[in-house]
From Swiss-Prot:
The lineage of its organism: Eukaryota, Fungi, Fungi incertae sedis, Microsporidia, Unikaryonidae. InterPro entries: AlkB_tRNA_MeTrf/Diox, Methyltransf_11, SAM-dependent_MTases_sf. GO terms for molecular function: S-adenosylmethionine-dependent methyltransferase activity; tRNA methyltransferase activity. It comes from Encephalitozoon cuniculi (strain GB-M1) (Microsporidian parasite). Signal peptide: none annotated. Gene3D superfamilies: Vaccinia Virus protein VP39. This is Putative methyltransferase ECU09_1500. GO terms for biological process: methylation; tRNA modification. Belongs to the methyltransferase superfamily. CDD domains: AdoMet_MTases (cd02440). It comes from the Eukaryota.
Length: 210
């Protein structure tokens, strides 16, 4: 894409800015692997970053820092009990190196419109993890096409789509829909060790280690 940041402003950030309240009302349940990941790796000493926290639905333990680009969703997240809420961009995380024991990235990087930007975000999340730290990554998989109304994103790859919101043709979000092979390749190319991976409904997840 010729202007990926402009494309994401139009088909990602604008969507969440204009629809944050309605969207947040439909996103109250945390994704299933999130609880299992925290049960396996969280301790009372852990500091956790939710990078792209949305409305805070993954705030399941103490000492969680929530970061999101959308101010409307961050306002909703205040009620969910995050220790600290920060407006920021996953492409340039506002944290020093090796700050966190655990990182969550739930339904975030599939909104980045080029492979280079997705890998950059992954490397940023790896940067802020402590050595040996763990990360849970979730993305939408290609099977999501069977459940929503998608159209191909002009100028993108065969995995780049625009999805309508509540069947409103004038409101669309961008997604890069992953296959498992491509997701795991991204993880290893970004310097992570893959500990586990699988599927949950139309989504794919990977448990990673720095």
């Amino acid at each position: 894409m010729d202007d990926p940041s402009g494309f994401e402003e139009r088909f990602v950030h604008r969507f969440y800015d204009e629809n944050s309240r309605e969207f947040s009302a439909t996103r109250r349940r945390h994704w299933g692997m999130t609880r299992r990941f925290l049960d396996n790796y969280y301790t009372r000493e852990s500091i956790v970053l939710d990078a792209g926290c949305g409305n805070g639905r993954s705030f399941l333990v103490p000492c969680m820092v929530g970061m999101d680009y959308c101010l409307g969703l961050l306002n909703d997240a205040r009620a969910a009990g995050g220790q600290g809420l920060v407006r920021g961009d996953v492409l340039e995380l506002p944290f020093v190196d090796c700050s966190f024991d655990l990182v969550l990235s739930v339904a975030v990087i599939h909104h980045l419109s080029t492979r280079c930007r997705r890998e950059r975000a992954m490397k940023e999340m790896r940067r802020v993890l402590k050595d040996g730290g763990k990360m849970l990554l979730y993305v939408w998989g290609s099977s999501a096409k069977s459940k929503r109304k998608f159209s191909r994103a002009a100028g993108g790859s065969e995995q780049d789509y625009l999805a309508t919101w509540n069947l409103r043709s004038d409101t669309k979000r961008y997604y890069h829909l992953y296959g498992m092979e491509g997701l795991l390749e991204l993880c290893t190319d970004s310097g992570f060790k893959v500990l586990d991976h699988g599927t949950e409904e139309e989504s794919l997840f990977a448990v990673l280690e720095k």
